[in-house]
Regions:
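Conserved nucleotide-sensing/catalytic segment adjacent to the nucleotide-binding pocket
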Residues: 1-51
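Conserved protein kinase catalytic core
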Residues: 2-6, 58-59, 79, 133
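Conserved catalytic network of the ASCE P-loop NTPase/AAA+ motor domain
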Residues: 39-44, 61-65, 115-116
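Short gly/ser/thr-rich secondary-structure transition/capping motifs
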Residues: 49-54, 103-107
Length: 145
């Protein structure tokens, strides 16, 4: 991620309130990620490299560098619970998290995350993982090694 002061600020579409937009691709230092990924691949030090994040499939250059693209689908209510637990652990209040989630996150999710999930090779159920689906993913990864 970029430093907090370098991240974009967005206005909520309905209320016009300004929020630091951590759900926008410009939040991520994509050039650094691309360089780090290339360096890790070229080093030969790693058999498997996992790139995780809600914007991973959005950038075409990053997608093209991945051998396997997975998207983990979660219901909106599960996403907010996970976000609340994580962000409250970072010291944010319930109201701070709930406000940005209600006012900005759904729009960014539709714009960048939902629209890019179709770039995945597999879409997995994040609410109820399937042992068969996980076995298929593991089998594919092992076939590349």
């Amino acid at each position: 991620f970029r430093a907090p002061g370098e991240r974009p600020v967005a206005e909520a579409p309905v209320t016009g309130r300004s929020y630091r937009d951590d759900n926008h691709p410009d939040t991520v230092d994509l050039e650094k990620l691309k360089g780090d990924l290339q360096q890790a691949r070229q080093s030969g030090e790693y058999e498997v490299i996992i790139v995780e994040g809600l914007l991973t499939l959005w950038d075409k250059e990053i997608r093209d560098r991945l051998n396997l693209r997975l998207y983990v689908e979660c219901r909106p209510d599960e996403r907010i619970v996970r976000r609340l637990r994580r962000n409250m652990g970072w010291g944010l209040s319930f109201d701070e998290i709930a406000d940005v989630y209600r006012e900005l996150v759904p729009y960014r999710h539709d714009e960048y995350v939902e629209s890019s999930k179709w770039q995945a090779d597999f879409i997995l159920n994040g609410s109820k993982p399937s042992p068969r689906a996980l076995d298929a993913v593991v089998l594919y990864i092992r076939s590349l090694l």
